[in-house]
Amino acid sequence: MDQIPQTQLEPEVRTGEGLSVRRFFTTPGEHPFDSVEWEMRDARIGHGDKVSFEQQGVEFPKSWSQNATNIVAQKYFRGQLGSPTREHSVQQMIGRVAGTIADWGRDRGYFATDDDADTFEAELTHILLHQMAAFNSPVWFNVGFEESPQCSACFILSVEDTMESILEWNTKEGMIFRGGSGSGINLSKIRGSMESLAKGGTASGPVSFMRGADAWAGTIKSGGKTRRAAKMVVLDVDHPDIREFIWCKAKEEDKAAALRDAGFDMSIDGEGFFSIQYQNANNSVRVTERFMQAVENDEEWQLIGRVTGTPIGDPIPARQLMREIAEAAWRCADPGIQYDTTINQWHTSPNSGRINASNPCSEYMHVDNSACNLASLNLMKFRRPDGTFDVASFEHAVDVMFLAQEIIVSPSSYPTEQIGANARAFRQLGMGYANLGAYLMANGVPYDSDAGRGTAAAITALMTGRAYLGSARTAAAMGPYDRYAENRDPHNAVMRMHRDASYAIPDSACSDADLLSAARRSWEEAVELGERTGYRNAQATVLAPTGTISFLMDCDTTGIEPDFSLVKFKELVGGGQMTIVNRTVPLALQTLGYNDEQIEQVVAYVNEHGTIVGAPDLADEHLPVFDVAVGERAISHMGHLKMMGATQPFLSGAISKTVNMPESATVEDIADAYLAAWRLGIKALAIYRDGSKTAQALRTDAQKDAPASKEAEIQKAVAEALAKTPQRRRMPRERRSITHKFSIGGHEGYITAGMYEDGTVGEIFLTDIGKEGST
């Protein structure tokens, strides 16, 4: 892509008189903070006497959980802990963010009147306060705290086939990692290891340079940052070194297994794991329509030299190459696949440059050297008591949040001048949602069903249609994005593709007729207005993993994911934890027509047994409603793929989602999944087969700190327990527990062990895993 000159923050190009903002959630003269009940709490993370974080006397809305209290106080309250400048109230945090964004909007002429600006600030404050939506983490970290804050979590870089460019790539990544964000890059311009250099000899090849970049990322990760360096490395399927790329991480897994067997510490921070290469990046192969057709038709595939652009080496059977991709993923969960033709078919700005790569989690895909700031809506906040979707509230929340994201673009800072220029020239935004799985379950709709997919498609279509309608309205007031003029025809064509896709959602698959009607109407309005005014933003929506911000919003499920399990841990105010049945289970039972007594019996059964199978009075036909990601009734991988296929046509970007497969899955199963995703129109897919990673960070701090004698005692106790006939011991209703944070391949989560009165472990829970680099 041509390098875009640095644009000035002022003046903005304006074609109107600013935007009007209507009141919906708030009342003039009443501050949103007065609409909730507040209470003082202590925020604490740790177990026993070992405390990793504690802040006493923090102020939170009474409706926010203790889980949210702990995470928000630790992650998002700004200022030195223990100092007078340290934030201690959600009022300070939300006021800092909403107030700063509103002031930026005032300064840059976004609002028609002062009253509109005040209304915007009040409505945004209400939305954030009531956990209806949340920005990505860098906004909470930096807005209102730094003069020119870094607000984006997603970056895409580029590299040329020169040593200068390769070294510059490493420098740019380092700057991004230092800020706690992630980046992606396509290395396909770098010549292959079998190609010649101008001054003689052969090239190192991209995989060799990946080794150095991975070490650099690992070093920065261990330099005191709380977020791991997050990377995506992409290579085109016709690159001469594609097979070396496919196998590079799988071969390192063999090394990891050997080190583990030799007694080395292979936990995520262990010295053994630190010597394993390529572990700081997700790898993806870029495949074209032509390659996938060659696989389907059992044709040969030719690799192409980077220097001459001519065939290099002998042709390879396309199916063999696909099998190698699947086998490597079977062994180590890498590489994933990105479907290049599909991605660029939906590209709004192809005349400015093609889409070559993505951010680390694969949801943001746009031109090289660009950025995206994210926000997510909490779908459960738009569920009415009767289960219908509150279209009016959702539309208004989209309007306010999308405008806030747009305002953020210009005053933000960026890691390089070129990224800043492109961010302001294209103004890419990434609105998404969380709690889809909880919403469907609460409505008695199975995740893996036509009704589940139809509902999700309608919600996604409404979100993106409404976002682009807002983008067109902002373009009327502020002007379209700088590169819109050269992309007018393709951008408008993609908008019509989105609109047409909304009419392909079967009416029978969405029981909420008002929701589907609103989705189609939003696209009609967005297309009609946008073709007259243009659009302010080249991209509007993605589906991010929503990691940490899902805790801020008290979500039961993250991103597009189904519920992880039916039983979870609840943090208690004042300390301690207790196991509870997901709050969506009683809602689902109520929706399905069960009475209070039956609901109480089913909930008690689930709490005791950890499964709903066999619960009293529960009809077999209702079991699919309670299918979750893992366990006895786990959703099949095709159920996950079909959900992605149903929602993908309504997103500017893509979907961050790792499709889990059981340990028994075969290489052929994985290859078939890659083919199925292509046929479904999905833009990217990553697969994780249970047990495929040797180095997994499930070793607890307590184990690490235990002396050898204690380790021996533990192993002896485990051996004795295994030798005995199993006997059930009922867990106490309230019990002590230990929670440990872990990371697998850059994806972080929490494992919690609940204990009996004597301190022995009686149950283990794994929370939803969030991914770094996006939220």
Set out the residue ranges of the language-model regions:
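Core structural elements
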Residues: 124-141, 402-408, 422-444, 545-546, ...
